[in-house]
Regions:
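Terminal amphipathic alpha-helical/low-complexity segments used for targeting or macromolecular assembly
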Residues: 1-7, 12-13, 18, 55, ...
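Structural signal for interior beta-strand "rungs" in well-ordered beta-sheet cores
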Residues: 3-190
Length: 269
């Protein structure tokens, strides 16, 4: 049974599936849809054209789909949407902005945990099973791949890609792409410290797959020489598995931009 508190303000166009619960003083704008089993606590604000999937938990005072923080965006400008998948936990005071382009969306996948005060900027992509600790701040146009874990107050520059199953220690200020499966720590810029073994275990990789990643890391980061040249040399070897190839691909792609952010190639300003 769908339950809506009488103090909630909900546009008549909003679509609520069976079992949705809307708490006191929520404001939900036009064009929003919310999937079954999703619980929306008190004082949550959901902006226009936000699509929310099943079994999510939205804690009090989070704001989803509010106007992007762009100086060049005129007062009457049209902006895009926000799509949130299933089984996400979005804690208090989280803010997630929609795309700045009317035909595009900011996208959040499934099974993610965004802790208190996390900010996700416009045009970002978060995949699945991501954990962001308190006050992580993600600038616009970033890509966060599956299984990434960002500790408290990590900051990402615009257009940064964080590869799958990476871990970033608290207070890291990340201004360039990070290949998959790695640990980074340090303030600005952080440094690669090793392989995220705990992440590999959570990913369900076999012992052989984990060993392949560890061996690739040694060849890429611990045997001297330039990282890009090491990656190109490793790419010449036969029989590399898909995980090692993903590491190599990320390194080569990020080298295509002078600051190490592959997605900068696609910016339209």
């Amino acid at each position: 049974m769908t339950q809506v508190h009488r103090s909630a303000v909900i546009d008549k166009s909003v679509q609520l599936d069976e079992g949705v619960m809307i708490g006191p003083n929520c404001v939900i704008d036009s064009g929003v849809s919310i999937g079954s089993g999703t619980v929306v606590d008190a004082n949550v604000v959901v902006g226009k054209n936000v699509k929310i999937g099943r079994d999510n938990r939205l804690f009090s005072s989070c704001t989803l789909g509010g106007r992007p923080q762009i100086l060049a965006l005129s007062h009457d400008a049209e902006f895009g949407g926000l799509v949130i998948g299933d089984r996400n936990v979005i804690r208090e005071q989280v803010t997630i902005h929609p795309s700045t382009h009317p035909e595009k969306v900011t996208e959040i996948g499934n099974d993610n945990l965004l802790m208190i005060g996390v900010h996700i900027g416009h045009d970002c992509l978060l995949q699945d099973k991501i954990v962001m600790s308190n006050y992580v701040q993600i600038s616009g146009h970033c890509r966060i791949e599956t299984g990434v874990w960002l500790s408290g107050m990590v900051l990402l520059h615009q257009f940064v890609t964080i590869g799958k199953w990476c871990y970033a220690a608290g207070l890291a200020g990340i201004n360039h792409d990070i290949p998959p499966f790695l640990i980074v720590s340090g303030h600005y810029p952080p440094k690669v410290r090793g392989v995220n073994k705990r992440g590999l275990a959570r990913a369900g990789l076999s012992e052989a797959q984990q060993n392949n990643i560890a061996e690739a890391y040694e060849k890429l980061y611990r045997r001297g020489g330039a990282l890009l040249e090491n990656a190109k040399g490793l790419a010449q070897q036969d029989g590399l598995d898909e995980n090692v190839l993903a590491m190599i691909d990320a390194i080569i792609k990020s080298s295509e931009h002078r600051f190490g952010r592959y997605l900068e190639k696609f910016r339209d300003d």
